[in-house]
Amino acid sequence: MLNNAMSVVILAAGKGTRMYSDLPKVLHTLAGKAMVQHVIDAANELGAAHVHLVYGHGGDLLKQALKDDNLNWVLQAEQLGTGHAMQQAAPFFADDEDILMLYGDVPLISVETLQRLRDAKPQGGIGLLTVKLDDPTGYGRITRENGKVTGIVEHKDATDEQRQIQEINTGILIANGADMKRWLAKLTNNNAQGEYYITDIIALAYQEGREIVAVHPQRLSEVEGVNNRLQLSRLERVYQSEQAEKLLLAGVMLRDPARFDLRGTLTHGRDVEIDTNVIIEGNVTLGHRVKIGAGCVIKNSVIGDDCEISPYTVVEDANLAAACTIGPFARLRPGAELLEGAHVGNFVEMKKARLGKGSKAGHLTYLGDAEIGDNVNIGAGTITCNYDGANKFKTIIGDDVFVGSDTQLVAPVTVGKGATIAAGTTVTRNVGENALAISRVPQTQKEGWRRPIKKK
């Protein structure tokens, strides 16, 4: 179906008192992303010509958090109801475009449902998203005559008979811009709340003989709003359950779907296995046959085929070629790169460092601002001393180098191909190819040595 041009209004002016937070409610995160960002992304995916964000409380924080989005900021200085919020945005509506109204605290609304609503909107009428609840207490009821929608009555204004109605308003609707402006101008606050209800435009449209078409979402969770942290946590679990189900159906083995969090996007190959309590953040790519152990955090990284990440490892902004092994308890920081078959063991940290093919850093090591060749052995306790208190410097280690345990490499320094660094050495000058570097104090031995005795 060919749709009219469309703009979106997102209401995000509420204080969120029940969140007990200094942060605007809509900036609280779901799956690692602000609730309102989920809604903005949906609007953009629908092809909105403009996104008008109605804000009030915490405007500076909102603008900072959403600075990368192309938004028209609309101030609602006083929160006098949803109709009043839309009135603030109305001057920006074009007469010949459709206006879709969304909410910054309803984060799981799907693009598919919104597209169905858009397609269902009758010419000159209103598309309305509704659901039926077993317990509709507190929600606006949908009134009908002969099956046709005639209006919405808020719970506090409803009669006892109207309160028996189970079909309720979700607050999401779409209408023509010229019609919307005309109806908004007619709103009054003559109701129990003393507010301007956007829902009153339904009755105004009906009185003009306009058709109102109700559409239902695919899932109830799509239209659930967040007023407190308990509700937010419940929607988080709904979202994570849906993501886990999609991954399982796509062939990813999640050992316990209830203990897996996806806070971004995951691209994966075949036969991927993910153990419990793993968190995926940002954009992550997993190759074929990748195995991730329990408690790992993977963020904005590419993991090659046949890699194995042992439990409680953190990988951030890193790239791993095929057949690498990491962990347990390893940390790859931004700029870490492992070439094919490299190994990083327990309590090893890498930052802006490359570990060559087949090279190993088995345990208790820091590799920062380093370029390490192929088939290098990094002994336990090795440290690249890359920082002098003001500037960072680079360590370069050639192919086939053996670095003994408890070695410090004071950058800038280069170790040539095939060199050996004796255990306990502090390297302060370049080491030539195939050379042995040793800086230990000669060992002495005192026969018959007696330990000091504590005085009583």
Curated annotation (Swiss-Prot):
<feature type="binding site">
    <location>
        <begin position="386"/>
        <end position="387"/>
    </location>
    <ligand>
        <name>acetyl-CoA</name>
    </ligand>
</feature>
<feature type="region of interest" description="Linker">
    <location>
        <begin position="230"/>
        <end position="250"/>
    </location>
</feature>
<dbReference type="InterPro" id="IPR001451">
    <property type="entry name" value="Hexapep"/>
</dbReference>
<comment type="pathway">
    <text>Nucleotide-sugar biosynthesis; UDP-N-acetyl-alpha-D-glucosamine biosynthesis; UDP-N-acetyl-alpha-D-glucosamine from N-acetyl-alpha-D-glucosamine 1-phosphate: step 1/1.</text>
</comment>
<dbReference type="GO" id="GO:0019134">
    <property type="term" value="F:glucosamine-1-phosphate N-acetyltransferase activity"/>
</dbReference>
<dbReference type="Pfam" id="PF12804">
    <property type="entry name" value="NTP_transf_3"/>
</dbReference>
<dbReference type="GO" id="GO:0000902">
    <property type="term" value="P:cell morphogenesis"/>
</dbReference>
<feature type="binding site">
    <location>
        <position position="351"/>
    </location>
    <ligand>
        <name>UDP-N-acetyl-alpha-D-glucosamine</name>
    </ligand>
</feature>
<feature type="binding site">
    <location>
        <position position="25"/>
    </location>
    <ligand>
        <name>UDP-N-acetyl-alpha-D-glucosamine</name>
    </ligand>
</feature>
<feature type="binding site">
    <location>
        <position position="105"/>
    </location>
    <ligand>
        <name>Mg(2+)</name>
    </ligand>
</feature>
<feature type="binding site">
    <location>
        <position position="333"/>
    </location>
    <ligand>
        <name>UDP-N-acetyl-alpha-D-glucosamine</name>
    </ligand>
</feature>
<feature type="binding site">
    <location>
        <begin position="11"/>
        <end position="14"/>
    </location>
    <ligand>
        <name>UDP-N-acetyl-alpha-D-glucosamine</name>
    </ligand>
</feature>
<keyword id="KW-0808">Transferase</keyword>
<feature type="binding site">
    <location>
        <begin position="81"/>
        <end position="82"/>
    </location>
    <ligand>
        <name>UDP-N-acetyl-alpha-D-glucosamine</name>
    </ligand>
</feature>
<dbReference type="InterPro" id="IPR038009">
    <property type="entry name" value="GlmU_C_LbH"/>
</dbReference>
<dbReference type="GO" id="GO:0016020">
    <property type="term" value="C:membrane"/>
</dbReference>
<feature type="binding site">
    <location>
        <position position="227"/>
    </location>
    <ligand>
        <name>Mg(2+)</name>
    </ligand>
</feature>
<dbReference type="InterPro" id="IPR018357">
    <property type="entry name" value="Hexapep_transf_CS"/>
</dbReference>
<dbReference type="InterPro" id="IPR029044">
    <property type="entry name" value="Nucleotide-diphossugar_trans"/>
</dbReference>
<dbReference type="Pfam" id="PF00132">
    <property type="entry name" value="Hexapep"/>
</dbReference>
<dbReference type="GO" id="GO:0006048">
    <property type="term" value="P:UDP-N-acetylglucosamine biosynthetic process"/>
</dbReference>
<feature type="binding site">
    <location>
        <position position="377"/>
    </location>
    <ligand>
        <name>UDP-N-acetyl-alpha-D-glucosamine</name>
    </ligand>
</feature>
<dbReference type="GO" id="GO:0008360">
    <property type="term" value="P:regulation of cell shape"/>
</dbReference>
<keyword id="KW-0133">Cell shape</keyword>
<feature type="region of interest" description="Pyrophosphorylase">
    <location>
        <begin position="1"/>
        <end position="229"/>
    </location>
</feature>
<feature type="binding site">
    <location>
        <position position="405"/>
    </location>
    <ligand>
        <name>acetyl-CoA</name>
    </ligand>
</feature>
<dbReference type="InterPro" id="IPR050065">
    <property type="entry name" value="GlmU-like"/>
</dbReference>
<dbReference type="GO" id="GO:0071555">
    <property type="term" value="P:cell wall organization"/>
</dbReference>
<keyword id="KW-0548">Nucleotidyltransferase</keyword>
<comment type="similarity">
    <text>In the C-terminal section; belongs to the transferase hexapeptide repeat family.</text>
</comment>
<feature type="binding site">
    <location>
        <position position="140"/>
    </location>
    <ligand>
        <name>UDP-N-acetyl-alpha-D-glucosamine</name>
    </ligand>
</feature>
<keyword id="KW-0479">Metal-binding</keyword>
<keyword id="KW-0460">Magnesium</keyword>
<feature type="binding site">
    <location>
        <position position="76"/>
    </location>
    <ligand>
        <name>UDP-N-acetyl-alpha-D-glucosamine</name>
    </ligand>
</feature>
<comment type="pathway">
    <text>Nucleotide-sugar biosynthesis; UDP-N-acetyl-alpha-D-glucosamine biosynthesis; N-acetyl-alpha-D-glucosamine 1-phosphate from alpha-D-glucosamine 6-phosphate (route II): step 2/2.</text>
</comment>
<keyword id="KW-0961">Cell wall biogenesis/degradation</keyword>
<dbReference type="InterPro" id="IPR011004">
    <property type="entry name" value="Trimer_LpxA-like_sf"/>
</dbReference>
<feature type="binding site">
    <location>
        <position position="380"/>
    </location>
    <ligand>
        <name>acetyl-CoA</name>
    </ligand>
</feature>
<feature type="binding site">
    <location>
        <position position="154"/>
    </location>
    <ligand>
        <name>UDP-N-acetyl-alpha-D-glucosamine</name>
    </ligand>
</feature>
<feature type="region of interest" description="N-acetyltransferase">
    <location>
        <begin position="251"/>
        <end position="456"/>
    </location>
</feature>
<comment type="subunit">
    <text>Homotrimer.</text>
</comment>
<feature type="binding site">
    <location>
        <position position="423"/>
    </location>
    <ligand>
        <name>acetyl-CoA</name>
    </ligand>
</feature>
